[in-house]
């Protein structure tokens, strides 16, 4: 009996150690898995430094979104830290509620053919995002996502017109706070990218006195509704 108990205890310890190893191996691959999914949605290169989570928070470090081909700026979007606050069980529901998303140290690159043109890097990216949401599986078509608060801290932006090749460093925006951002249809990640990115872009364009360009951008995106 004693030998049996020792063997059973040893087996339990081995199972626990195996579980811990599998967990850490899976966690180490998580940034690449999320980056790959985002890259497929946006059709651009995406890199993520690290991802950590608790039962109520997801923390993403050093997210970098590249530009589509034939654009000169290195990045379309970068953020040093993203904090997503919502119980993990919320993501299993049909109607998903996220209490708050905070983005710290944000950079956005805006690139257009000319001051008069509206064809640019974000036209391409948002078109790709809209297509990904439209093509989501039927099982996710009825899902809704509500972000109660979206907070951006310390936003820097560059503006480049390809016609003159000059990079303009726009004034830093200390903070943007958006509330009650909602969307329906598509999986959670596609909805977050489409609704949250759209609202962030709109507010940044307004703050940088570029709202007219923003409105024209959304007119060019098939199947999208202008962000209100």
PLM segments and residue spans:
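N-terminal leader/targeting pre-sequences
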Residues: 43-70, 153
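N-terminal start-of-chain detector that recognizes signal peptides
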Residues: 17-25, 30-36, 54-57, 71-76, ...
